[in-house]
Amino acid sequence: AQACTQYAATDEDKEKYVGDQLVDTDESIGSTEVEEPVVEEVPSEKYLDVTISDTPISFKIKEENSQILIESVKEVPENYYIYIGNNGKDAVVLDPNQNINIVYASGEIKNVTLAQYIGPDGEVYIKDNIRNLYQGYIWHSTPVQISEKKVAYITNIPYFGYNLNKYISIIDIDSNTHSTIWASKATEIVFEQMNEKGLEVNIDGNLRYITSNGELIQ
């Protein structure tokens, strides 16, 4: 019988005999790498959730230049009025009971409501009592932020009753003081848009402006 000598491949050769076939065992040869698809991460929306007068409100917020800003309102609750001002640093919220709150992007809430008005004779007029006594009375209406520290709103104060004239009042946010612009007296007042001169106001059909300092100009 003829002797048969078999060659055994070493690990370095990475080859072996299988039956009569010489097989290359280097897995890297002929293999195909499958690239994983790149999935772009969609930034998740972020919200600031607050409660005003037992009503939840969600503000959509964003980060810009390392600063948190209010971008929009997810949904304005029924009979609420919301004005986002001050370049998104805060929002002014008027609830159905005519309370005014400033909501800051940080989550802080500041109530700047005029809870009562004290007349020249010292008599005290309480907001909720007046509103219950005179249906449709305007204590606070359509507040608009005219600067970082001031808010303008429309009111019937300082008079009480029915069929009253309207006035523009200014809130100083820091001191929470309210002051009337007497020259704004009118049957109808409508706040329009902000521009270079300030807040555009239609007063009985006449165009005026409220400056960032709270002054009424032509």
Indicate where each model-derived feature is located.
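Repeated scaffold domains used in trafficking and secretory/extracellular systems
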Residues: 77-83, 138-142, 185-196
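Extracytoplasmic beta-rich ectodomain segments of secreted or membrane-anchored proteins
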Residues: 63-112
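Intrinsically disordered, low-complexity segments enriched in Gly and acidic/Ser/Thr residues
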Residues: 138-187
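N-terminal, intrinsically disordered, polar/charged segments of Gram-positive cell-envelope systems
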Residues: 1-73
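Surface-exposed loop and turn segments in beta-propeller and other repeat-based domains
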Residues: 53-72, 109-134, 185
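Structural motif
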Residues: 97-103, 156-157, 161-171, 206-217
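Acidic, small-residue rich beta-repeat scaffolds with periodic aromatic anchors
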Residues: 4-27, 171-218
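Short beta-strand elements that form the blades of beta-propeller/WD-repeat-like
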Residues: 40, 49, 83-95, 101, ...
